[in-house]
């Protein structure tokens, strides 16, 4: 796993919800975020998609609570995330920022989050 992936996962775990790189271990407990990290050249912006997974029979409301929390953390200008060991990334909202994921099960509700990540790691 690259430092950019480690830094994004660490930041999401500390500020939003447990986060795992895909494939997620089958014993992970809902709710959580999953991602398949994408990294581009130094200082280039890359699209990154996250999935927020929750359990509910009928509502996406819990998933949207986490999406709202993430949206507030990122703000309208993005958020700079720095770590002495892992480097620096800047996270921006993608477009669309959030959308329902149509699920095959009646008890899992998930939303897709689109981000733009600028990676300043070598």
Go through each PLM region and give its residues.
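Charged, amphipathic alpha-helical segments and their flanking helix caps
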Residues: 1-20, 26-29, 34-122
